Amino acid sequence: DLRMSRGLGDVYKRQLIQEYTELLIYRISETSLVKDRDFKLVLIDDRSLNAFAAPGGIIGVNAGLFIHADNEGQFASVIAHELAHVSQRHFARGILRGQDTNLASALVLISSIALAIVSNNPTAFIAGPAALAQEQLRYSRVFEREADRFGFNNLINAGYDPKTSLLYTSPSPRDIRRSRM
């Protein structure tokens, strides 16, 4: 069970949690596609079930993950998912895609304004930005599915029973909010 004893002092508990989580991250990263394994763990005092990965090897884990995970497999599945974001370079790919879409966004915006003027229909302006927002959501979901797939495979390679993982049960985004890296 991942829930820590209430009898332990806060400093000692935090140190145990830090060490446990770092060991778990390194254990799972050994079977992952992550090349640079220089991680920096950030523990966040937030009860929501969340974790994230950021550039520079930063792995953030909310306290809620310890509270809500029923077993190590569930906890490990979230870590594996975040490591998949790192190995697949989702943050960098998102930035590169953002640079590509800036010009497209400007063109869509100008076209939407022109359409609204020509058609004498101000609501025509909404179609372009709505389509852009929909495309961004689709792209984000692609990253999440990719991280689920790579994370799930890595979880198995790391020796975890996939039936105990959160990736196996496919929780809804409301159940686990994950970063877009």
Spans of model-derived segments:
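Hydrophobic or amphipathic, alpha-helical segments that drive membrane association/targeting
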Residues: 1-52, 125, 133
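Single conserved hydrophobic/aromatic residue that forms the stacking wall/gate
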Residues: 2-8, 12, 168-181
